[in-house]
Amino acid sequence: MNKAIKTVGFMFIMILLSKVLGQVREMFIASTFGAGGIADAYYAASSLPLNLFDIVFASAISSAFIPVYNTYIEKEGIEEGDRFASGFINTIFLGSVIISAILMIFSDLFIYIMAPGLHGDVHNLAVKLTIIMTPIIVFASLTFCFSGLLQSKGEFNVPAVISIISNSAVIIYIIFFNKYFGIYGLAFALLIGWGLQFLVQIPSAHKNGFRYKRVFYHKGLKDVVKLALPVLVGTWIQPISNMINNAYASSLDKGISSLNYASKLYLIVSAVFTVSVTNYVFPLLSKQSALEDKDGYKKTLCASFKIIVAVLVPICALMLALHTPIIEIVYKRGEFGDEAVRLTAGAFYWYSFGIIFYGVLDLLNKAFYAQKNSIIPAITAVCAIALNFVLSYFLKSLMGIYGLALSAALVYAFMAITLFIALNKKVRFFSLKDGVFFIKAIIYGIVSLIVTKGVFTLLSPIDTSVLLKIVRTGISCVAGVGVYGIFIILFERKLIKELKKN
């Protein structure tokens, strides 16, 4: 238990630092380029290779590779495991090069399809930036391969640190070199950052015993394909939803950039408090499933579920209560003015309703993948994509950019609830008694929201500068989280003891 706490604690700190730097990066971009045409072109271009990577490779690597690799390590030894890993890495590398070449050749067509609202110079700029950033697909694929390999070997520290390097590269560029190279240099800086993420993991992989083999085919690749195809479909919801929202938002003034600023902050907040848990738990669930340790699997899953819910409920309350001051503090400077704040804060507010569902969705997906069951997540994702398309169309007509954010939140809720029901029906990891905690956590969260909003309103006379706004917002956050924490300590002692055991 102590080792687990230390590992997850270190991962949390590193992920927190990484996400903070990621948000600092977004703050610099917002301040330098605002929420206009240049920013729209950059986000349309940068999202293309990243979304294609997510659609084709990301979850196949992180969710299909780890269970199969662990199976070979446990049953056939390290040598055979490394042969499988080498064959997998080589296959992924070749596939990512082919996808990158296709995107570079047809970049104009891709931008036209994915961001039809961009015209003239903005469209042309997006095409040029896409060509520059397309090799990110190759570096991201290799980065994910080595991160999965290291996590399977029990090395969580290096994968948790690598994003710090790439975010730092972009920040350094904006501070020191942006005045010379502008938006094109920013695209190259992002590309270099992804390359560094891959390179820094190679020494750690060697240190942890991985030995690369010149293997271009391994029988285990068939197992990966069987698991990966439905996994890919199951994880299409995030990138395809991004593409749908960008396509709709491109017809709105400052739509793409405002939606991106809001969604990235929302995803950063969620990831900080969930990724450290799910990244640690997934290899553990995979091993428990491979060893047919059903009781251990259920206990690990239930404890992880409760931790994520307990942490995200007060975060959701803070985001709902303080969405506008949060956006003002994070983004409002330079080219990012009042109108951009209004649009981004509104989108951030509606995104916030989905943060709890988004957090548990990641855990539930990985719980299915640990059992080598990817059919149910795949079917759910297909339904969710269709739902998102319909909801985005109608809600955009009613609410503009805010409707796109609400659509995303509702889709996450649909997926999380569907997967929860399906998984609990199969393994019975969550009882009615456990469900009482969820209801109580929501009640505590509502009280926290009221307290946070009340304190923020009471402190309005001191809000006369940026520094005092930060102080006002900080005090309100502490008050809201403090009340929630008191409820947990006073009324959930049994839960705290249970989590310590697991």
What do these predicted regions represent?
Residues 1-502:
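Membrane-embedded alpha-helical bundles of multi-pass transporters/translocases
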